[in-house]
């Protein structure tokens, strides 16, 4: 806590948001006075780990956690400490916590623990996953009645979008004040934004993140969703990460580009010395092909998630892989050997980034361990298949 305490004193922090991503990807925790945060260990009841998005608990509650609903010990990760830029009154900080059992072990059900276990497996093999997320979302008008359909908000022109505006700069600029504030918030929290894109839907946007450490990538998606919602609400609109918020508009995805580096050499193990594809590259893809069906609850965790998965709207409906082909579930973008990677297009924007990354890395790992073989790369429109 020494480095955290010094940082809190340097920035004259008065309040600390002590966060833990739950199983749904939402933030749970406590807001504590800085003085209390520095001197007291935070605890949370174990049952919080399995609270559903609607506030209820699993029918298997007593089989998953201790029946006494005992406390977990929450320990802050110093690497996630940052300012909360939307606190207007006094300087505030936020920090993501890891959950530990009373016996001192990382809690097995905490989503950061799940991802850490997968990354440990890779570390034992001398490999380091590199992940670059792409998250899509909609800006929508505020609506107090939950039974009414969501609608695009009014932009600077005084009217809502009514047509498809893929990659339109002017359509993005309709909400320029929102995104300027978003960029300010991202800078304050150290979020590595690579690009902002207008997607196919009305007021649908996409944010690309720089590639990097897998746990850091999950943290950034988790933090960004809070940032985007806060920036939107400051302008009296809302940002939704539902997979399919509007019936007649495309769904929102959370794509993950992934590659593997050798810890020893730092080189991409998906490419050999001649720049050609390696066997590991194909084993990894084959693992995703074999295990993705079983992992769909991590990629599509809600009923609404499956409304997104339909032909002709850039959502995958097959396990095919292909080169620069957006109709397949596993796309290999055009790149040089050093950037050879696989894009998993199955997850929706509503997926928990920690669990979705853990799932996709696990599938690839099993493919390599079992030396699975891929199908041939798909050529053409995969939606043409029945």
Mark where each language-model region is.
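Short beta-strand elements
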Residues: 148-157, 254-262, 319-321, 328-334
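Catalytic-core signal marking the mid-to-C-terminal active-site face
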Residues: 230-231, 237-238, 263-386
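Short, hydrophobic beta-strand segments
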Residues: 95-101, 205-211, 258, 344
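A short, glycine/Asx- and small/polar-enriched loop/turn
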Residues: 203-205, 250-256
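Accessory "access/gating" subregions that flank catalytic or transport cores
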Residues: 166, 171-175, 179-193, 207-214, ...
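ATP/Mg2+-dependent ligation/transfer catalytic cores
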Residues: 1-193, 217, 355
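Short, solvent-exposed loop/turn elements at beta->coil junctions and helix N-caps
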Residues: 243-248
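Short, conserved phosphate-binding/catalytic loop or strand-edge motifs used
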Residues: 135, 199-207
């Amino acid at each position: 806590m020494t480095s955290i305490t010094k940082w809190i004193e340097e920035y004259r922090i008065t309040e600390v948001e002590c966060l833990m991503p739950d199983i749904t990807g939402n933030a749970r925790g406590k807001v504590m006075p800085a003085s209390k945060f520095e001197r007291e260990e935070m605890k949370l009841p174990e049952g919080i780990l399995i609270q559903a998005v609607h506030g209820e608990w699993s029918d298997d509650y007593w089989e998953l956690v201790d029946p006494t609903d005992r406390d977990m010990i929450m320990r802050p990760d110093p690497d996630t400490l940052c300012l909360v830029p939307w606190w207007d009154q006094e300087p505030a900080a936020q920090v993501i916590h890891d959950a530990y059992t009373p016996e001192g072990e990382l809690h097995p059900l905490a989503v950061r623990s799940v991802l850490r276990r997968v990354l440990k497996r890779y570390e034992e093999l001398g490999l380091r996953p590199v992940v670059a997320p792409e998250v899509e979302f909609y800006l929508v008008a505020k609506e107090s009645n939950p039974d009414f359909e969501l609608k695009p908000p009014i932009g600077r022109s005084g009217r809502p979008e009514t047509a498809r505006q893929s990659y339109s700069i002017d359509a993005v600029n309709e909400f320029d004040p929102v995104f300027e504030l978003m960029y300010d918030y991202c800078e304050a929290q150290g979020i590595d934004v690579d690009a902002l894109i207008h997607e196919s839907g009305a007021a649908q946007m996409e944010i690309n993140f720089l590639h990097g450490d897998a746990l850091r990538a999950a943290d950034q998606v988790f933090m960004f969703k809070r940032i985007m919602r806060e920036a939107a609400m400051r302008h009296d609109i809302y940002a939704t990460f539902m997979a399919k918020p509007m019936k007649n508009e495309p769904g929102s995805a959370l794509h993950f580009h992934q590659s593997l580096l050798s810890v020893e050499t730092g080189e991409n193990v998906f490419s050999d010395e001649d720049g050609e594809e390696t066997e590991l590259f194909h084993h990894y893809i084959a693992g995703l092909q074999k295990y993705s069906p079983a992992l769909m609850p991590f990629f599509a965790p809600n009923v609404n998630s499956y409304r997104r998965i339909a032909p002709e709207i850039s959502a995958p409906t097959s396990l095919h892989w292909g080169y620069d082909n957006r109709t397949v579930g596993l796309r290999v973008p055009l790149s040089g050997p050093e950037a050879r990677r696989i894009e998993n297009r199955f997850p929706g924007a509503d997926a928990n980034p920690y669990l979705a990354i853990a799932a996709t890395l696990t599938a690839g790992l099993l493919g390599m361990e079992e030396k699975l073989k891929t199908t041939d790369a798909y050529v053409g429109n995969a939606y043409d298949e029945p």
